Amino acid sequence: SIDLQVGTMHNSGSIVADDAITVHGNTIHNDNGLIKGRTTTVVADTDVRNTQGTIEGRDHTTVYAKNDVINEGGTIKQTDEKGKLVVAADRDVINNGVKYEASNSKVVWNSANGRRETVTAVDQGQIAAKGDAVVTAGRDVAMQAGTVTSGKDATVAAGRQVTMKAMTEN
């Protein structure tokens, strides 16, 4: 088991436990990092920001912030069908995709032909459970190129509104 009590955490590596992992702090930033355990709990006194990282638990995954949970192109998941995933914020849950562009990439059809092109793609914000998924916000749940999926029951609830949008080209 791992129990981390931090002020502000910026994780860009891997924090992995065979059993339970708990991270509690003022602000939690998971930037392209991995936080993973059998039971994974991430709690922030202000914000949790998961930017293209992964927060994963097998049996249970809980991500809670007193202000906002912001998932930008990242994955928050629970991987056992008997388990539960909870993402909750007293203010907003924001689950957005991140657009990126790869330009001047060489594409070769054969030895005599080739061209260069620009590819624009989106890493979706993913909140995914094999078991039950619960996403709740005191104010708003907002998703742009974000998904919430569940192998069983999914609940998305907000004190004010739930908005879902596709990612646009601009």
Predicted region positions:
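Binding/recognition "hotspot" determinant
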Residues: S1-N170
